[in-house]
A protein has these predicted regions:
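Conserved G/P- and acidic residue-centered "switch" motifs that form tight phosphate/ATP-binding loops
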Residues: 37
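His/acidic metal-ligating clusters that form di-metal
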Residues: 128
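ATP/NTP-dependent adenylation/nucleotidyl-transfer catalytic domains that generate, transfer
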Residues: 1-32, 42, 46-49, 54-77, ...
Length: 292
């Protein structure tokens, strides 16, 4: 089930596939929402290479990056987003008006006085961000890039109508642990080239705890109840291979450090996967034959 990939080859495949797609569809611009997290950082690095290569080949292309912070965005997230945006985007902006817009919408959802729970307000912010990104993409005649990975897809770590929306996502089939490993290699490559701003930007992103930046929880692991995403990947891979077997073993062994991942943690992760199944089968429609 979990076949090891060649990380360097994976980077090249993603770059070449995006170049081919942009040319085929006559697209000359792409927009990426940059949070400072490792997922948007990887897409930013790849898109930087795509833009460089396309322009060097005589194909005009512009890569736009946008950071849309709110009051629930940690300062270290914004700092990482700025480092990544300035290092890898052809054009980068921080739009600080997102907080004002999201405050109005959240107040409206709470009937102008009732404080709504963090999950609802977080979903609203995620959807507002996509409104902005898609409008931005329309303005520059481009498309919106996605940053979801396979682990988050299986966990339902996205908002329907929000960050689950995108036009092109080069890394949907990568496990989160693979995203980390590819970024580590890219960071080392830039360090070897003495391109320290780019190396530092990736390193800063790697050092951040994965979080949604929407105020839903302190970080992803608080929501999941695991040590880190490497354990989560081990659990999900075990489950996909053994989902027909009843119950869980007392533990499984971490592929990283030999830690015994307990059944309690496995149960939390697998329940989250099962409870988010509707997100992976959305939207639901009826076939025409049902009406006849």
């Amino acid at each position: 089930m979990n076949q090891t990939i060649d990380y360097s080859k994976a980077s090249r495949v993603m770059i070449d596939s995006m170049k081919e797609y942009f040319k085929k569809c006559n697209l000359h611009a792409a927009v990426l929402g940059i949070s400072g997290g490792i997922d948007s950082t990887l897409v930013a690095v790849l898109m930087h290479k795509v833009s460089q290569e396309l322009n060097s080949e005589g194909y005009s292309f512009t890569f736009y990056g946008v950071s849309l912070p709110t009051k629930t965005t940690y300062s270290k997230e914004l700092w990482a987003a700025q480092l990544v945006g300035n290092a890898f985007c052809d054009n980068f902006e921080v739009n600080n008006e997102m907080e004002e817009a999201s405050s109005v919408v959240v107040d409206w959802l709470g009937n102008w006085g009732v404080k709504i729970e963090p999950l609802r307000s977080g979903n609203a912010k995620s959807r507002l961000r996509m409104i902005y990104l898609y409008d931005f993409a329309k303005k520059v005649n481009g498309i919106v890039m996605g940053t979801d990975n396979y682990t988050e897809y299986l966990l339902g770590f996205s908002t329907i109508g929000g960050d689950a929306l995108f036009d092109y996502n080069p890394m949907q089939e990568l496990w989160k642990s693979e995203v980390f490993e590819i970024c580590k290699i890219l960071q080392e490559q830039y360090a070897d080239l003495k391109d320290y701003p780019k190396a530092a930007a990736i390193m800063t992103s790697l050092a951040l705890k994965p979080m949604d930046g929407l105020g839903i929880s302190a970080d992803d692991m608080v929501q999941i109840g695991a040590r880190h995403y490497y354990d989560v990947d081990d659990i999900l891979q075990w489950y996909l291979e053994n989902q027909d077997r009843p119950g869980y073993p007392d533990y499984i062994i971490s592929s990283v450090d030999g830690y015994k991942i307990p059944a309690k943690t496995m149960d939390l992760v697998i329940k989250r996967h099962k409870n988010s199944e509707f997100k992976r089968n959305h939207p639901v429609t009826l076939s025409r034959e049902r009406y006849i």
